[in-house]
Curated annotation (Swiss-Prot):
Sorted UniProt keywords: Aminoacyl-tRNA synthetase, ATP-binding, Cytoplasm, Ligase, Metal-binding, Nucleotide-binding, Protein biosynthesis, Zinc
Uppermost EC category: ligase
Residues binding Zn(2+), per UniProt: C900, C903, C920, C923
HAMAP family listed in its UniProt record: Ile_tRNA_synth_type1
GO molecular function: aminoacyl-tRNA deacylase activity; ATP binding; isoleucine-tRNA ligase activity; tRNA binding; zinc ion binding
Sequence positions that bind ATP: K605
Localisation: Cytoplasm
Free-text note regarding domains: IleRS has two distinct active sites: one for aminoacylation and one for editing. The misactivated valine is translocated from the active site to the editing site, which sterically excludes the correctly activated isoleucine. The single editing site contains two valyl binding pockets, one specific for each substrate (Val-AMP or Val-tRNA(Ile)).
UniProt-recorded name of the protein: Isoleucine--tRNA ligase
Assembly behavior: Monomer.
Length: 937
């Protein structure tokens, strides 16, 4: 038996079937770095229209997690797809480097600033720690295949950046948005300082729970407002912090709640007590109120500014409205001490109530106070309760175990205490109304993002930007000791400070002798030692990064972060940008969801469902992680697990194997000399290129709209259905058996080349490592990297009136699927071994006959059978079942003819040639003659 293998055009490629991503990807990263790929992209696209995606800075602490990976991969896909679209799309990554978590890590190593080490040394250690964290995270982000200016990232702790933060504060001062005021903060009596939220732990605590009556001062006013007859009504509050009652300045009701007056006897004493109607039954029982009558309801909205008597002090307090008032517990009325609670403080600001906190830094009440003067907070509950008993205003005393804020260091209960702070005012210079206006100009994706940030800005309180921390950018201001006014030369002073910080970092401020800048005035001014909220640091990146770097600009085209950033970075960026430039810092804001496991549960070490990106790239490769990010609809929760990633691996193999088939069949093809013009190509080849053009247009639109999961679907379906399920199977015979330089084969190779060029670009933003590997295996001239390319422009369309256009081939595909199903049935019934051992008879109506007869003898190459015959539908045997195609029935017969040793078709002329008794006539023509001629398939 002669071996005809050498006469076939068998596929050849250096592109391996086994991806080996976890081994190959690091080498590819090294290559990109050595060739300075990012800089080459910048040079190649210089002068093109800009697209600026501004990177929200992750915090420089700890290893990156799966959420970080999602965020960076999404950004990378956008930047790469924008580059393909012809934009100059620089990507400058950044890190948030100041703040409490870093302080806590450094404290564990060197002790607290001002105790075991001086503040300057502590800041130096913080800077060193943050630098190490940045280095580790940077390495991990690069490992994901993210291209960016990794050699020049922005760090909020860089001296120049710190200086520009101070300059941005100066602009906010210039524009009239900064004010000094009081705000309640968590205060640790043991630390003697304010605590940030991250330093607060919640533990169970037993506290006194008291119901307290606030008698109405003007009964006639109450009766007139409520329509309720009463002689000595009182409004009742419930509190677990009796010690705060000396600072009470109001009682809050909800304007939309209804209230009733309960008249009855309590321990033999007649009482008239106003409470929320929804809680009345519970309170009657809890208090043991007897002989109760209940009034008609009165709306809370009618009680505003009703005067009440303080329950044990010589003072009157008003009724105010509070949206925070609920009927979840208590009485539906809330004791309001603006100096001791955030909600109370907000209400107090609306009503201009004094946010007094009579508690000193050391936890002692001021000496001049009645009842509690000179006492420590921890000792004040009992005398307050006794005073309430004496005045007859204690309705009920009980104990309650509840969750209460504690100091994370000392494990002791905290108090809320109003202290002097610095604020960005929402209304002083109209910042909040401007924010609402500007929101309408921004595109929010998904659309619900707009409603979310609008809701968060509704009645937003002033932004407290001051922190009593060591590791942060200073609020570099001088305040007059007598008037509390800022120095009149503040703008010039801020610039002088910024210039010093640019050279020496924030220590330049903390070490500064005010006389160096103020001269003889130094004694009249205090140097502010507070630091800025880290949300201010990251919030002004539009000024410190976009405005300062030549290749960037503000506003950015896109901000992209997790859905929690409507409260965080999106908002701090918007407010600071409006305060500085009176415009939003972004044109579009895109939000992604959080990662959960396959059951929708949050990632948790205790549950054991954490997927670490480091494990994924070490095991499966970063491209698998990237494919998962692309395939998942990121606008909701993103499910990930080992099983899900394994499924992604299967999808990846489909795309890789399809690409490998294309490359292996381009062996020996030189585009410059071998490619055919569209009019020279076979009909099927022209169709598949037209189909690729159609898919490319869809994919480009999907990338432009950030619909990445649909990009994945289009990419996967084109590989699996258009190519794998139709075109590639059909062309194998022509590709392998026709003469190497025949029109039939070169037509096919031309189509494969165009498809490969397009396909590699479609996948490049997603499967970045794999795309580069494919690209370097393409024949012909290439750029230095696929990431220097733009969308492929070599695809072409079929004319709308083409003889064998889209509609024709779509119907042929339907018929082929019907044939495939019939062949599978025959194979299952062991009638045939494979499709080439079969002959099919297609019983067709007039419409199907007109369609399929146009392929002539080449119909068998489409059905991939040894023969394909058309007969009238009326002649179909009765036992033949209908197919999925109207007017088509399929009969599968085992071929009686001998099998050609070269093409494996069963043909009647096998054996008719004496020199090649094992070949069919077609193969003899291809081996020794002029070669067969194909027209369609």
């Amino acid at each position: 038996m002669t071996d005809y293998k050498a006469t076939l055009n068998l596929p050849q490629t250096g592109f391996p079937m086994k991806a080996g991503l976890s081994q190959r990807e690091p080498a590819r990263l090294k290559e990109w770095q050595q060739k300075q790929l990012y800089q080459k992209i910048r040079e190649a696209f210089a002068g093109r229209p800009k697209f600026i995606l501004h990177d929200g800075p992750p915090y420089a602490n700890g290893d990156i997690h799966i959420g970080h990976a999602v965020n960076k991969i999404l950004k990378d896909m956008i930047v790469k797809s924008r580059t393909l679209a012809g934009f100059d799309a620089p990507y400058v990554p950044g890190w948030d480097c100041h703040g409490l978590p870093i302080e806590l890590m450094v404290e564990k190593k060197v002790g607290k600033a001002g105790h075991k080490v001086d503040a300057g040394t502590f800041r130096k250690k913080c800077r060193e720690y943050a630098s190490k964290q940045v280095a580790g995270q940077k390495s991990d982000f690069m490992r994901l295949g993210v291209l960016g200016d990794w050699d020049n990232p922005y760090l909020t702790m860089d001296f120049t950046f710190e200086a520009n933060i101070i300059r941005s504060l100066g602009k906010i001062v210039d524009n009239g948005h900064l004010q000094q005021g009081f705000k309640p903060v968590h205060w640790c009596l043991d630390c003697g300082s304010a605590l940030a939220e991250a330093e607060v732990e919640y533990e169970d605590k037993i506290s006194p729970a008291i119901d307290v009556a606030f008698p109405v001062v003007d009964v006639a006013d109450f009766v007139a407002r409520s329509g309720i007859e009463a002689s000595a009504p009182a409004l009742v509050i419930w509190t677990t912090t009796p010690w705060t009652l000396p600072a009470n300045r109001a009682v809050a009701v909800h304007p939309e709640l209804d209230y009733v007056l309960l008249s009855g006897e309590l321990s033999g004493v007649a009482r008239e007590l106003l409470v929320a109607e929804a809680l009345a039954d519970d309170l009657v029982t809890r208090w043991g109120l007897e002989n109760v009558t209940r009034s008609a309801a009165v709306a809370g909205s009618k009680l505003e500014m009703l005067a009440l008597q303080h329950p044990f002090l010589e003072a009157q307090v008003p009724v105010v409205f509070g949206e925070h008032v609920t009927t979840d517990a208590g009485t539906g009325l809330v004791h309001t001490a603006p100096g001791h609670g955030v909600d109370d403080f907000m209400v107090g600001k609306q009503y201009d109530l004094d946010p007094i906190s009579p508690v000193l830094d050391n936890g002692l009440f001021r000496e001049d106070l009645p009842v509690v003067g000179g006492l420590h907070v921890s000792k004040a509950n009992e005398p307050v309760i006794e005073a309430l008993k004496d005045s007859g205003n204690l309705v009920k005393l009980a104990k309650i175990e509840h969750s209460y804020p504690h100091c994370w260091r000392h494990k002791t209960p905290l108090i809320f205490r109003a202290t002097a702070q610095w604020f960005v005012s929402m209304d002083q210079a109209g910042l909040l109304p401007r924010a609402r206006q500007e929101i309408d100009k921004v595109q929010w994706l998904p659309e619900w993002g707009k409603a979310r940030i609008e809701g968060m800005l509704t009645d937003r309180p002033d932004w407290c930007i001051s922190r009593q921390r060591t590791w942060g950018v200073p609020i570099a201001l001088f305040v007059n000791k007598e008037t509390s006014e800022l120095h009149p030369q503040t703008p010039a002073l801020i610039e002088q400070v910024a210039q010093r910080v640019e050279k020496a970092g924030v220590d330049a401020w903390f070490d500064l002798d005010p006389a160096e800048l103020l001269g003889d005035e130094a004694d009249q001014y205090s140097k502010v030692t507070d630091t800025l909220d880290v949300w201010f640091d990251s919030g002004v990146t539009h000024y410190c990064v976009l405005d300062q770097r030549e290749q960037l600009r503000a506003p950015a085209d896109l901000y992209l972060e997790g859905s929690d950033q409507h409260r965080g970075w999106f908002q701090s960026s918007l407010l600071t940008s409006l305060a500085i430039r009176d415009a939003a810092p972004y044109s579009t804001v895109l939000t992604h969801g959080f990662t959960v496991d396959e059951h929708g549960r949050k990632m948790s070490k205790s549950v054991g469902n954490v997927i670490a990106p480091q494990e994924v790239w070490n095991d499966l490769g970063a491209d698998i992680l990237r494919l998962w990010v692309c395939a998942t609809d990121y606008r909701g929760e993103m499910s990930v697990s080992k099983d899900i990633l394994k499924q992604m691996g299967d999808s990846y193999r489909r795309i890789r194997n399809t690409s490998r088939f294309l490359l292996s069949n381009l062996s020996g093809f030189e585009p410059a000399t071998d490619a055919l013009q569209p009019e020279q190509m076979l009909a099927l080849d022209r169709y598949i290129v037209d189909r690729a053009l159609q898919v490319q247009a869809e994919i480009q639109d999907l990338y432009d709209g950030y619909h990445f999961h649909q990009v994945y679907q289009k990419l996967h379906n084109f590989c699996a259905l258009d190519l794998g399920g139709f075109y590639l199977d059909i062309i194998k015979d022509r590709q392998y058996t026709t003469q190497a330089d025949s029109v039939a084969r070169r037509s096919c190779q031309t189509a494969l080349y165009h498809i490969a060029q397009a396909l590699v670009r479609w996948m490049a933003p997603v499967l970045s490592f794999t795309a580069e590997e494919i690209y370097e295996n393409l024949p012909g001239e290439r750029l230095d990297s696929v990431f220097l390319a733009e969308w492929y422009d070599g695809l072409f369309a079929l004319a709308d009136n083409a003889d064998m256009g889209r509609a024709f081939w779509d119907k042929v595909q339907d018929a082929k699927q019907a044939v495939n199903k019939a062949i599978e049935g025959a194979r299952a019934a062991k009638l045939i071994k494979g499709s080439l051992s079969a002959e099919v008879v297609l019983f067709v109506d007039a419409e199907q006959n007109a369609l399929l007869q146009r392929l002539g003898d080449e119909l068998r190459f489409v059905t991939i059978t040894s023969a394909a015959v058309l007969k009238p539908l009326a002649e179909a045997p009765a036992e033949l079942e209908d197919t999925s195609v109207a007017g088509l029935k399929v009969q599968v017969l085992a071929s009686d003819h001998a099998k050609c040793a070269r093409c494996w078709h069963h043909q009647p002329d096998v054996g008719s040639h004496a020199e090649h008794p094992e070949l069919c006539g077609r193969c003899i023509t291809n081996v020794e003659g002029d070669g067969e001629v194909r027209h369609y398939a």
